[in-house]
Regions:
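A short glycine-rich, Lys/Arg-flanked "PGG" loop and its adjoining helix->strand segment in the class I
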Residues: 133-145
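Class I SAM-dependent methyltransferase SAM/SAH-binding core
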Residues: 52-54, 58-107
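A short SAM/SAH-binding and catalytic strip from SAM-dependent methyltransferases
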Residues: 117-130
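Helix-to-beta-strand junctions that scaffold the AdoMet/dcAdoMet cofactor pocket
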Residues: 70, 128, 143-145
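Conserved class I S-adenosyl-L-methionine
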Residues: 1-44, 60, 167
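A short acidic, Gly/Pro-enriched loop at the edge of an enzyme's catalytic core
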Residues: 110-118
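C-terminal alpha-helical "lid/dimerization" subdomain adjacent to the S-adenosyl-L-methionine
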Residues: 4-7, 151-193, 197-204
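Short glycine-centered segments of the SAM/dcSAM-binding site in methyltransferase folds
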Residues: 50, 74, 146-148
Length: 216
């Protein structure tokens, strides 16, 4: 979000954007790949699902989700980085029912009760709280009744209680928005916006969580 939220580290460009997937694999010692695959399996995607991928990036996650969809399914990715969008189009070229749109996710979106599932992976923490709430409201509006919202991101924890070998890189790599994000009760926040039926799955020693909620 450099142009919109200078303190954020969610939006990347240049060398980092061009080699994003490789860098993430290196930083996590290959762990991210197994986490995202596990998370997508836990989504229990149906062949005809319509999925909205917020902050879709290179399309890596979208391509994994597309493998669970039939020709009658659909995936729409949203991103604002031209470099990421270019990679998405290249990576997902074999899936005609997957598309990427250049659109901010923290502003009103045109979708209303259209999607069965919405997925957001390591993006929500990079916004200030009011923008996060707008994103959640966009998700609620975009989902069909009983539609599912999946947030793969940091769990709630205290930086002070992290082991030193994790605390130092976390504080170096992340931004102030992330430090705020991990202190929030996201189940409570989502419930206040109309979501319920929560389900949680943890990764990386409980520092990462897949939080599922349902529009009721």
């Amino acid at each position: 979000m450099c142009a919109y939220y200078p303190a954020s580290k969610v939006e990347v460009g240049g060398f980092t954007a061009r080699h994003y997937d490789r860098l993430i694999n290196t930083i996590t010692f290959g762990g991210y790949s197994s986490v995202i695959q596990s998370a997508i399996r836990l989504m229990m995607i149906k062949p005809i699902d319509k999925i909205l991928d917020l902050g879709a990036g290179t399309g890596r996650n979208a391509c994994l989700m597309m493998k669970h969809l039939s020709a009658n399914g659909e995936l729409v990715g949203l991103d604002i980085s031209e470099e990421m969008i270019s990679q998405f189009k290249k990576n997902c070229a074999v899936f005609p029912n997957a598309k990427i749109i250049n659109k901010r996710i923290d502003k009103d979106l045109p979708y209303e009760e259209y999607f069965d599932k919405v997925f957001i992976s390591f993006v929500l923490h990079g916004f200030p709280q009011e923008a996060r709430k707008q994103i959640i409201r966009n998700v609620f509006k975009a989902l069909k009744k009983d539609g599912e919202f999946f947030i793969l991101d940091y769990n709630e924890f205290s930086i002070k209680e992290m082991p030193l070998y994790l605390r130092i890189p976390f504080k170096f790599m992340e931004c102030s928005y992330a430090f705020d994000f991990i202190e929030k009760d996201w189940q409570k926040i989502l419930a206040e916006e109309g979501f319920n039926h929560f389900e949680k799955h943890f990764f990386f020693g409980n520092y990462v969580r897949l939080l599922r909620s349902v529009k009721v």
